[in-house]
């Protein structure tokens, strides 16, 4: 049997190319989504592009399923609008997104889903604050950052509770222009930092998709560069489809019950059984 690298690659590429598109799987077989979507862009190297380019995707919070994704050349407003519009065409019942501090994401989402709740990842926001402080050399800066950590620790019960703690921090550091500027920025972004207060069960970080990104990164390390945009589309689709049909093993806390289950299993319509879908996949090869 000839198992040369070239022949193995050709065979794998053919199999990957025969897989149904992630969006087609969702359109035909899935409907049980919670509507809370954690979104991000993951960058990959593709031949012909000077810089890494992203595939944009989101994870339905309660099912951990990936309804669809979009390949793009940047995280522009147009790219994100195309992604959210693809979700709308799939009848994805989006009510809230959790995202990093890229204004294109929120604007594009609201352009397609005007009533959506926007929750900014508090971890990303705090990291930006850390970068503006001299935490290594200045004890006062470290103390202030501890206060900010306390302000964002867990979920506040109400905006008034958040304001109360914020006011205490302001009064303590009112004579420090840098700290006051940071607190004013927090106040200006309060509507998206406290988006979780506007709906039930909305997380305040993108930790879930960060863990998926780490998983995908492990696979990208074995591929220095995709040969073309088309090749990247095929391999990314295969990777995501595989993730949707692979059992979870490392879920913790409130999601421990997902271990041993597939995300497609949680999002599929009640009339779709896994054995039937396995037969459909088998017919592709």
Regions found by a protein language model. Name each.
Residues 7, 207, 211, 234-238:
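Amphipathic alpha-helical interaction segments
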Residues 89, 93-98, 105-231, 247, ...:
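Extended amphipathic alpha-helical interaction segments
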Residues 10-14, 18-19, 78, 122-132, ...:
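Short alpha-helical interface patches
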Residues 51, 56, 106, 212-213, ...:
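Short, hydrophobic, well-ordered secondary-structure elements
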Residues 218-283:
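Basic, amphipathic alpha-helical segments enriched in Lys/Arg and hydrophobic/aromatic residues
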Residues 32-36, 147, 255-259:
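Short alpha-helical linear motifs
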Residues 3-98, 103, 208:
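RNase H-like nuclease fold core
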């Amino acid at each position: 049997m000839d198992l040369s690298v070239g022949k193995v690659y050709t065979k794998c590429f053919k199999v990957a190319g025969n897989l149904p598109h992630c969006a087609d799987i969702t359109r035909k077989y899935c409907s049980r989504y919670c509507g809370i979507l954690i979104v991000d862009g993951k960058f990959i190297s593709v031949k012909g592009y000077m810089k890494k380019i992203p595939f944009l995707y989101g994870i339905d919070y309660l099912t951990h399923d990936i309804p669809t994704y979009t390949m793009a050349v940047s995280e522009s407003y147009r790219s994100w609008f195309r992604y959210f519009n693809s979700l709308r065409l799939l009848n994805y019942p989006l009510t809230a997104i959790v995202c990093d501090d890229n204004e294109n994401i929120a604007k594009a989402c609201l352009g397609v889903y005007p009533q959506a709740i926007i929750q900014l990842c508090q971890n990303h926001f705090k990291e930006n604050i850390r970068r503006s402080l001299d935490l290594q050399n200045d004890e006062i800066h470290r103390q202030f950052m501890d206060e900010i950590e306390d302000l964002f620790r867990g979920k506040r019960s109400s905006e008034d509770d958040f304001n109360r703690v914020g006011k205490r921090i302001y009064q303590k550091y009112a004579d420090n222009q840098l700290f006051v500027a940071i607190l004013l920025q927090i106040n200006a972004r309060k509507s998206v930092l406290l988006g979780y207060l506007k709906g039930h069960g909305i997380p305040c970080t993108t930790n879930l998709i960060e863990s998926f990104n780490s998983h995908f990164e492990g696979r990208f390390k074995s591929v220095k560069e995709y040969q073309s945009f088309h090749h990247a589309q095929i391999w990314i689709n295969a990777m995501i489809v595989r993730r949707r049909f692979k059992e979870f093993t490392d879920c913790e806390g409130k999601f421990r019950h997902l271990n041993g289950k597939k995300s497609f299993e949680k999002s599929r319509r009640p009339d779709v059984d896994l054995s039937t879908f396995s037969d459909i996949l088998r017919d592709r090869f």
